[in-house]
Amino acid sequence: MMALWSLLHLTFLGFSITLLLVHGQGFQGTAAIWPSLFNVNLSKKVQESIQIPNNGSAPLLVDVRVFVSNVFNVDILRYTMSSMLLLRLSWLDTRLAWNTSAHPRHAITLPWESLWTPRLTILEALWVDWRDQSPQARVDQDGHVKLNLALATETNCNFELLHFPRDHSNCSLSFYALSNTAMELEFQAHVVNEIVSVKREYVVYDLKTQVPPQQLVPCFQVTLRLKNTALKSIIALLVPAEALLLADVCGGLLPLRAIERIGYKVTLLLSYLVLHSSLVQALPSSSSCNPLLIYYFTILLLLLFLSTIETVLLAGLLARGNLGAKSGPSPAPRGEQREHGNPGPHPAEEPSRGVKGSQRSWPETADRIFFLVYVVGVLCTQFVFAGIWMWAACKSDAAPGEAAPHGRRPRL
């Protein structure tokens, strides 16, 4: 009781804040109680009031309700996300209770510097912006304290990269009270999803809280489950690669004798080399569990390279064979054949020449076989990649800090 009045006196002089009642009544009779501020024991009582309340052998239980109002600026390349939260903390401090029969006030508000409040630190935060620099705590007549803290923060997130850009990730926010021990303080956390806007690439589809066990420092953890719903990434990454692969397959329909085929294939390969560099740069990377698209784009590059090499080799062999046929001994003139009594080719030989001319050379036959095998290989690649995408899973190695609770030495 005396600690409460000491806080009230300090509030009037040090902070110049008017105490408000639930029903809107102002504090009266201040002139009569001001002389007590010069009491010698005042500083001791004030110091006692800003210490953690004693709950006997049990730790003080602080109920925390986390209201998530927005998640934005999710950057998977930087492994960061921004969020806006409202923390509603409540606990019991019997030192602040008063008798309503003597002092008919149901509730008062106090600046949080004048009483004990849990000092929270977000472990994953790069920066934290507390929206209210001087929040007010509401104290009920029975000593229940309620404090609302609004904040915006940017935190690190361990994104799931394997299935990017259709990834599902769990991002955690760990709140620690570093000025207290687990024997003094305990959190009971709840989370509420108040996000009303879904026009984001990443959508929060689930929230959960937990209190990690075996911690020397009291803490609670809020986990946000994010789902990537962006269609832009799929169009920007997959459509150009698939279009070039389809164009390469269609290029196999050109005859091997066509001069344009080699230029067509080489142009596609060079175009995909430039595209491959930009595609890989647009994908996130990690020491483990890299996106499957990195391997997929590399396989497409190998397919285009193999197709181009096949065209160049077989076209070169075909041109060399034609050049050898042209440089062979030329047949004797028709006049000389008649002089030697050779009446010329038999009429039955003419159809045989036509049949022989319609037959394909072995490079062209090999090209047709390669084309069929290449088409089958491309289709199999698509189906195999789809199966791997659906059933593949990858678990990264545990970080060194996750091998032991906070404040302990890692296990060897």
From Swiss-Prot:
Entry's Gene Ontology molecular function annotations: extracellular ligand-gated monoatomic ion channel activity; ligand-gated monoatomic cation channel activity; ligand-gated monoatomic ion channel activity; pH-gated monoatomic ion channel activity; transmembrane signaling receptor activity; zinc ion binding
Main location per the UniProt record: membrane
Nucleotide-binding found in the keyword field: no
Entry's transmembrane regions: 234-254, 266-286, 299-319, 369-389
GO terms under biological process: monoatomic ion transmembrane transport; response to zinc ion
Segments on the Extracellular face: 26-233, 287-298, 390-412
Membrane-topology annotation of the record: Multi-pass membrane protein
Description of how activity is regulated: Inhibited by the divalent cations magnesium and calcium.
Modification after translation, per record: Glycosylated.
Cytoplasmic side: 255-265, 320-368
Catalytic activity: Na(+)(in) = Na(+)(out); K(+)(in) = K(+)(out)
Signal peptide (from-to): 1-25
Disulfide bonding pattern of the chain: 157-171
Protein name: Ligand-gated cation channel ZACN
Species whose genome carries this gene: Homo sapiens (Human)
